[in-house]
Amino acid sequence: MHELSIAMSIVDMAQEEAERRKVHIDAVHLELGALSGVVKEALLFSYKVACDGTPLEGSRLVVKDVPIEVYCSVCKVPRRLASMQWFCCPDCGTQTPEVIHGKELVITALELKQ
């Protein structure tokens, strides 16, 4: 389960930033792409485990799901895919290997305790 090592890295990065700014963190906001290879539920569970005994204990991991978006070279516009099974434009059917969004695994914000 690589989600635990990812969660530990998230906690480490957030903790370093909290120490640098001398603040306490209430939540870590994350964008998680459908193609990231990370299971959201496993990451949420692992985050709680990784936070135990750290200054982030009790904080929340807020995950924003990022759908798969590809660029269609025929339609000349980005298209959102319903699933990752077929990388084809949903309008014209052209194969679309150019992924614009969906691979994300990015900390986007740290929510500070009041």
Task: Give the positions of each predicted feature.
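N-terminal loops that bind phosphate or other acidic moieties
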Residues: 114
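Short cysteine-rich clusters marking metal-coordination/redox-active sites
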Residues: 72-75, 89-92
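Immediate flanking context of iron-sulfur cluster ligation sites
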Residues: 62-66, 70, 81-82
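Cys/His-enriched microdomains
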Residues: 70, 87, 105
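Long, charged N-terminal interaction/targeting segments
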Residues: 1-59
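Short loop/turn motifs enriched for small/polar and acidic residues
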Residues: 31-35, 64-68, 110
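Short Cys/His-rich "knuckle" micro-motifs
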Residues: 82-85, 99-103
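Cys/His-rich microdomains that often coordinate metals
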Residues: 78-79, 96
